[in-house]
Amino acid sequence: MAAVNWLKDEPYPEKPTRRNHLSFGPARLPTGDWDWIMTYYKPEAREWLRTMNNPLWSGPEDVLGLLPAGVPVTEKIFVKEVYPGLKGFLQMFIPVKVAGCLLFGFSPLSRTGMATLKTAPVFRGGYAPAAPGIPMQVYAWEMACKIDAAPRLFKWELIVGEYFVRLATLSECSAGGDVGAYIRGGRPISIEAAAVKTRELASTLYLLAQNNVYHGDVKIANTVITEPHGRLGLIDFEMAHPLDMTMSGLREGLEVPIKWDMVCTDEYRAPEGHGPFPDILSAEAQLVWQVGLFMLDVIGIEIIENRNQGLWEQPDFPGLAAREVGIGRSLLACEHRAFLDYLTIARGCLRTNPRERPRLTLLIAQLTKFIREVATQPEH
């Protein structure tokens, strides 16, 4: 983290003037919720806020619209809940929205100017076997960053108390929330782009597994895009683990409370369950299943409501899928053959028998072939 401190040594109020007004990039703010920024942050911080230029912003309304949902960080929230314990993170981060344990705001450390500060209890996990003293979720996140498959992690701090463990992280902020929220926000995806994002996800999971890193909770809500045409990234590494789950506890004497049957959101768990998972092939079959669900999710097929019905195993699934997608809402118009071929790949990932699912390398090859073929088809 850059050795620059934008916080005032002692906060003191300043009145906004015509020359000394508060703006977030092209959005000039009326007097209100964020006047406290002038009290706590130095003039150079406010000057940077005025000059922010994110390529995703087409006008003032986009400045706050692309930050994930949340309520404004008022002076009361800042003073009581943020400022006392997080000063080390606030030196180069200005929070403007809050949602639960997440603060969204702006930082020059980020390529887009947008950043996220998260501070939350750690209930599961341990230290990374390959990096003593580094929490597994931080190790997994940094490993994903090395392959450009996660928002950049700028700073982290593990706070270990007698009865609790908390982790604070400052990182790049995604555009408009997770990939599903981004698309539902009026940005329908093409069938080619959906396949590209799926290939990026599969490639990321393969490379992480090669380094004995498993995310632990793969789903569309844990995938993001940080910049225009940028690579898909993973977030929320709280359940990250090595294959054999062997980790030392974050607190001395505490057994690591994480097992294979605990990781993964229930709706995204493959039908065979986790079991002990003694080998890489079984773990990879789980990942492929989750990639298949992502393929349906990203084009607007709500799998959570339908997965227990085995919707994709029904003979009339393509017709049902076409009606549920609602062309134009989540998916741009495409050739019918391309739509069917895409569903065929997804259904292959969702076979009940894990041995019948493709390996990640084969899935990546299938998606590459599909993308190449779709690219030669006429546009609609």
Curated annotation (Swiss-Prot):
What keywords tag this UniProt record?
ATP-binding, Kinase, Nucleotide-binding, Serine/threonine-protein kinase, Transferase
Q: Which Gene3D superfamilies match?
A: Transferase(Phosphotransferase) domain 1
Q: Which domain of life is it from?
A: Viruses
Tell me which EC number(s) this protein carries: 2.7.11.1
The protein, known as: Protein kinase ORF15
Q: Where is the Protein kinase domain?
A: 93-371
User: What chemistry does it catalyse, as a reaction equation?
Assistant: L-seryl-[protein] + ATP = O-phospho-L-seryl-[protein] + ADP + H(+); L-threonyl-[protein] + ATP = O-phospho-L-threonyl-[protein] + ADP + H(+)
Tell me which residues bind ATP: 118
Q: What is annotated as the active site?
A: 217
Q: Which family is it part of?
A: Belongs to the protein kinase superfamily. Ser/Thr protein kinase family.
Q: Which InterPro entries match?
A: Kinase-like_dom_sf, Prot_kinase_dom, Ser/Thr_kinase_AS
The record's GO molecular-function terms, alphabetically, read: ATP binding; protein serine kinase activity; protein serine/threonine kinase activity
Listed PROSITE patterns: PROTEIN_KINASE_DOM, PROTEIN_KINASE_ST
- Give the organism, scientific name: Ictalurid herpesvirus 1 (strain Auburn) (IcHV-1)
